[in-house]
Structures are given as structure tokens and as C-alpha cells.
A protein has these predicted regions:
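C-terminal segment of classical bacterial N-terminal signal peptides
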Residues: 15-20
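Carbohydrate-interacting regions of secretory-pathway proteins
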Residues: 22-282
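Sec-dependent N-terminal signal peptides
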Residues: 5-14
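N-terminal secretory signal peptides that target proteins for export/translocation
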Residues: 1-2
Length: 282
């Protein structure tokens, strides 16, 4: 037990504890905008950026408006990886196999930590494509101090998938790797995704540990973090303590000490588009 604990502790060099205090609550400026404090990078000196974003009367902040990537950066990076682009029609897209060989990939995060929130967006995939929406993500440094662990070992994932043509749709258990599922743990029911090339509506709500996934206006997944049931689900997944102890520890303590984290979009190597990304603090 001690050896295992030390192994995990050496891997979990979280750059979050010193940053949390600087990430103040979002300020509604009263003029249709809100000020959001975002971290500019993971490694090196802490730097902060004040982003002014549109906010509507219901409290939804537009964190991607089809034009600007202000507040976004690569996971574990201080810049936007070049395989991500804003398309002429106002989408945030990962180029996938259409990217040049020398272009940089990697997951993308909106660099403000959210605790209780509701996220809404639209997504579509190319034929056979795979991606994901991650939440409560942490940036976890590997023991050598130079790289980060994969984002998905600290963050629950709302699966984004072409259910008809990607092999992952038939893997896992009871279709728990299909779109809108809590990846590898809870299948989305009913499974009401639209085919590749068509837009899907996604909503993720996190409030005091209760998490809800919606797909095309329908509640398809609901579960409770930080409970014995959550731990049991992890133990039955690819993130179990026996299979992947670091991932198990991080996900069992999802969101860290403050139960908050980043919203992320996954680079799974495939073409995907996102648009109208909005978030509301609860």
C-alpha cells in the first residue's frame, strides 16, 4: 500500500493548488459582458489573463463565439495547437487527418476552472470520427516535470462519436462508449445521436456532484460524483485501481480538493467541429 501511495504521489504534481486562489469568480459587468480570469500556461511563472466575454440575460457566457479563441489554450501548453482552427463558418474544429504532418495536436481547454456549471454546445463529426468533451479536468505533471498526463485520466468524458462507423461504438459494455455516454462507464439512454455530418446538441450540468448529460434535448446520463457508487463504477472500468492506479486516484477524487476544473475538447486524431459553446455558473 505504501509503495502504491508513493507511486501515485510522485505522479500527481498538480499545478492547481497555488492557482485556485487567483481564479476568482466570474464577474458580470452589467453591460452584456462578463470578465473571466484565465490561466495563460501550465509550466513556468503563473500568468493570468482577463477575458471579457458576452453574457446573456440567463447568465450563459459565450466562451467560443465563432471568431475568437481568447481564454482557450492547449492542455498543458500556453498556446493553441495548430491542428485546432476557427473555420470561416464560425466553428472550432480539429483538423484530424487533414492537418499537415508538421502541425501540432493536443487537447484544448478553456483555461478557467468551473465548479458548479451548465455547459451547452453543438458538435458534429466526420465519418468514423471520435472526440470528447471533458470536464473538471486537472493539469497533471508527470514525474520528470516536463510533460502532462493525458487529460482523460483526471476528467469525466462526455463521448463524441460517429456511432455508425467508429469501432469504439461496439466496444466497452452495453454501448457505454457511444456518443453522450459517460465514457466507459454509463451508456447514454436513449441513444439519440444524429449521423456524422449533422449537428448534435450537447449539455452537461454539474451541481454539487450530480452530473447530467443531455443529447439533443434529452437527459441520457445522470450520476453522482464522490460516492461509493462512483468508486464502484471506476473499479469496473478501464480506469480501475488494478488497471490504471493513477487514473483511478484522480477520477475518484475528480476536481481535486476544490471540486473544480477545466472544460476540455479532445484531440483523438479525427475531424470534429464544435460551435456555440456557452457556460453558466450555477
Amino acid at each position: 500500500m505504501m509503495k502504491r501511495t508513493l507511486l501515485i504521489a510522485s505522479a500527481l504534481l498538480l499545478l492547481g493548488s497555488s492557482r485556485v486562489s487567483a481564479e476568482s469568480k466570474i464577474v458580470n459587468n452589467g453591460n452584456g459582458t462578463a470578465t473571466v480570469i484565465c490561466s495563460q500556461g501550465l509550466l513556468g511563472p503563473e500568468k493570468w489573463d482577463k477575458q471579457v466575454k458576452p453574457i446573456d440575460k440567463k447568465g450563459y457566457i459565450t466562451i467560443f463565439d465563432g471568431k475568437s479563441l481568447g481564454g482557450w489554450r492547449g492542455y498543458g501548453k500556453n498556446h493553441i495547437p495548430s491542428k485546432w482552427e476557427v473555420t470561416p463558418d464560425g466553428c472550432l474544429s480539429f483538423k484530424g487527418k487533414e492537418a499537415a504532418k508538421d502541425e501540432e495536436g493536443g487537447d484544448l481547454i478553456f483555461a478557467h476552472k468551473f465548479k458548479n456549471f451548465e455547459l451547452t454546445l453543438q458538435w458534429k463529426v466526420d465519418k468514423g470520427s471520435n472526440s470528447g468533451i471533458l470536464y473538471l479536468a486537472q493539469e497533471v505533471i508527470k514525474p520528470d516535470g516536463s510533460k502532462v498526463e493525458p487529460i482523460y485520466i483526471s476528467a469525466p468524458e462526455y463521448q463524441v462519436l460517429d456511432n455508425q462507423n467508429h469501432p469504439d461504438a461496439k466496444l466497452g459494455k452495453d454501448h457505454n462508449r457511444q456518443s453522450a455516454s459517460l465514457y466507459d462507464m454509463i451508456p447514454a439512454k436513449p441513444q439519440n445521436s444524429k449521423p456524422y455530418g449533422e449537428w448534435n446538441e450537447a449539455k452537461i450540468r454539474v451541481q454539487n456532484g450530480t452530473v447530467s448529460h443531455y443529447q439533443n434535448g434529452v437527459l441520457v446520463v445522470q450520476y453522482k460524483l464522490w460516492t461509493p457508487e462512483w468508486t464502484k463504477m471506476l473499479q469496473a472500468s478501464k480506469f480501475s485501481e488494478a488497471k490504471w492506479p493513477v487514473a483511478f486516484y484522480l477520477l475518484d477524487n475528480c476536481g481535486g480538493a476544490n471540486h473544480e476544473g477545466y472544460i476540455g475538447l479532445q484531440d483523438h486524431g479525427d475531424r470534429v467541429w464544435y460551435r456555440n459553446i456557452k457556460v453558466k455558473e450555477l
